[in-house]
C-alpha cells in the first residue's frame, strides 16, 4: 500500500509540474481577443483555493467533525498569533515567487524555464548550510557544480536565437532574471519554512493555511498596486477562461503535491519525477507549442541538470560489517 502511494504521488507530481508549466506558458502567449487575464489575480485565487483544500484536509483529519475542525483552527491559528505571524515572511516571498513565474513563462519557453528553474537546488542547498547548519557531502557539492554548468549550457544562445527577431534579447533577459530571482526566493522561503516546521509541532496543513492567509493578503496588495486600474476597469476576473482556471487549480495543488511526495517518497524518486517532467516539457514544447527548437548544447545542459538532480539526492549507504556467528 505504501509503495503504491509513493509512486502515485510521484506520478501526480510529474503531471502537476509538467501541466502547470505548459498551460501557464500557453495561457500567457495565446493570442485572443479582449484583455488577457491578470497574473496577479491568478496568484490570489490560487492561494484561496489552497486554503480551502487544506481546510478540507484538516476536516478529514478531524474525523469529519465541524466542531473539531473549528476547535483545531481556533487553537492552532487564532490562539497562537506569534506562531501564525512566523509565516508572514515566507508567505510574502512565495507570493513574489509565484508572480515571477508568470513573468518568466511569458518570456521563456517551457523547456528552458524548467531546466533553469532547477537552480533552486543550488540556492536551497546554500541556505540549508547557512540557516540549518546542514552538512553537504562530496556528492552534493559535486552535483551543485554540475548543475551550474548545465544551466549555463541551457542558457547559451544558439545561432537561431541570435538571428531571431521574434524573441527579443530584452524579453529573454527579463525571463532569465525572473527565473533567477524565483530560484533565490524559493531557496530561502523553502528553508525558512522547513526551519519553522522542524521547530514546532503544528501540522503541515495548518502551516499551509497560515501561508495561504498571508499569501492572499500580499497578493491582493500586489493586485491593488500593479493592476488596480485594470481591475477597476475590466473586473477582477477579466480574461478568465477554462485554461486560466486549469492554471490556477494546478498552481494551488502544487504545495499539496510536494507535501505528499515528501511524506511518501524520497529525494531520488523526486529527482526522477523532476527529470521526467523536464523531458516531457521539452517534447511538448517542440511538438505542440512549437516555440522551442532544441540544440545539441541544450541537450547537453539538460542531461547535466538531470544528472545533478539525481546526484544531489543520492545517499550512499556505508557498507555494513558482517555479523559474527
Curated annotation (Swiss-Prot):
One of its GO terms (cellular component) is Golgi apparatus. InterPro entries: Nuc_sug_transpt. GO terms for biological process: transmembrane transport; UDP-N-acetylglucosamine metabolic process; UDP-N-acetylglucosamine transmembrane transport. It comes from the Eukaryota. O-Glcnacylation regulates the stability of SLC35A3 and the specific complex formation with MGAT4B. It is found in: Golgi apparatus membrane. Keywords: Antiport, Autism spectrum disorder, Disease variant, Epilepsy, Golgi apparatus, Intellectual disability, Membrane, Sugar transport, Transmembrane, Transmembrane helix, Transport. It catalyses: UMP(out) + UDP-N-acetyl-alpha-D-glucosamine(in) = UMP(in) + UDP-N-acetyl-alpha-D-glucosamine(out). It is a multi-pass membrane protein. GO terms for molecular function: antiporter activity; UDP-galactose transmembrane transporter activity; UDP-N-acetylglucosamine transmembrane transporter activity. The chain crosses the membrane at residues 8-24, 42-58, 138-154, 173-189, 209-225, 246-262, 268-284, 295-311. Its main location: Golgi. The keyword Membrane applies. Belongs to the nucleotide-sugar transporter family. SLC35A subfamily. Transports diphosphate-N-acetylglucosamine (UDP-GlcNAc) from the cytosol into the lumen of the Golgi apparatus, functioning as an antiporter that exchanges UDP-N-acetyl-alpha-D-glucosamine for UMP. May supply UDP-GlcNAc as substrate for Golgi-resident glycosyltransferases that generate highly branched, multiantennary complex N-glycans and keratan sulfate. However, the exact role of SLC35A3 still needs to be elucidated, it could be a member of a catalytically more efficient multiprotein complex rather than function independently as a single transporter. Interacts with SLC35A2; the interaction is reduced in the presence of SLC35A4. Found in a complex with SLC35A2 and SLC35A4. Interacts with MGAT4B. It is linked to Arthrogryposis, impaired intellectual development, and seizures: A disease characterized by arthrogryposis, intellectual disability, autism spectrum disorder, and epilepsy. Additional features include limb malformations, distal joint involvement, microcephaly, retromicrognathia, and general muscle hypotonia. This is UDP-N-acetylglucosamine transporter. It comes from Homo sapiens.
Amino acid at each position: 500500500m505504501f509503495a503504491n502511494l509513493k509512486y502515485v504521488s510521484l506520478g501526480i507530481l510529474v503531471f502537476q509540474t509538467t501541466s502547470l508549466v505548459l498551460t501557464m506558458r500557453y495561457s500567457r502567449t495565446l493570442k485572443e481577443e479582449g484583455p488577457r487575464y491578470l497574473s496577479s489575480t491568478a496568484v490570489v485565487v490560487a492561494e484561496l483555493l489552497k486554503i480551502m483544500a487544506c481546510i478540507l484536509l484538516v476536516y478529514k483529519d478531524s474525523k469529519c467533525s465541524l466542531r473539531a475542525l473549528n476547535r483545531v483552527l481556533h487553537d492552532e491559528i487564532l490562539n497562537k498569533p506569534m506562531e501564525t505571524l512566523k509565516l508572514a515572511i515566507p508567505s510574502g516571498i512565495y507570493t513574489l515567487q509565484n508572480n515571477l513565474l508568470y513573468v518568466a513563462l511569458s518570456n521563456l519557453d517551457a523547456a528552458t524555464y524548467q531546466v533553469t528553474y532547477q537552480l533552486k537546488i543550488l540556492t536551497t542547498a546554500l541556505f540549508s548550510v547557512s540557516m540549518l547548519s546542514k552538512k553537504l557531502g562530496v556528492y552534493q557539492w559535486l552535483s551543485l557544480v554540475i548543475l551550474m554548468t548545465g544551466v549555463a549550457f541551457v542558457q547559451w544562445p544558439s545561432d537561431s536565437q541570435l538571428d531571431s527577431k521574434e524573441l527579443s534579447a530584452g524579453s529573454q533577459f527579463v525571463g532569465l532574471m525572473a527565473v533567477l530571482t524565483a530560484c533565490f526566493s524559493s531557496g530561502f522561503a523553502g528553508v525558512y519554512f522547513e526551519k519553522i516546521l522542524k521547530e514546532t509541532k503544528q501540522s503541515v496543513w495548518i502551516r499551509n493555511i497560515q501561508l495561504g492567509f498571508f499569501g492572499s493578503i500580499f497578493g491582493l496588495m500586489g493586485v491593488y498596486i500593479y493592476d488596480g486600474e485594470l481591475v477597476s476597469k475590466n473586473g477582477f476576473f477579466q480574461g478568465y477562461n477554462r485554461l486560466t482556471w486549469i492554471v490556477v487549480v494546478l498552481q494551488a495543488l502544487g504545495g499539496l503535491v510536494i507535501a505528499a511526495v515528501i511524506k511518501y517518497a524520497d529525494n531520488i524518486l523526486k529527482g526522477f519525477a523532476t527529470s521526467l517532467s523536464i523531458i516531457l516539457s521539452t517534447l511538448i514544447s517542440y511538438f505542440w507549442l512549437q516555440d522551442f527548437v532544441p540544440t545539441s548544447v541544450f541537450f547537453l545542459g539538460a542531461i547535466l541538470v538531470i544528472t545533478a538532480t539525481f546526484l544531489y539526492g543520492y545517499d550512499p549507504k556505508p557498507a555494513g560489517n558482517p555479523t559474527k556467528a
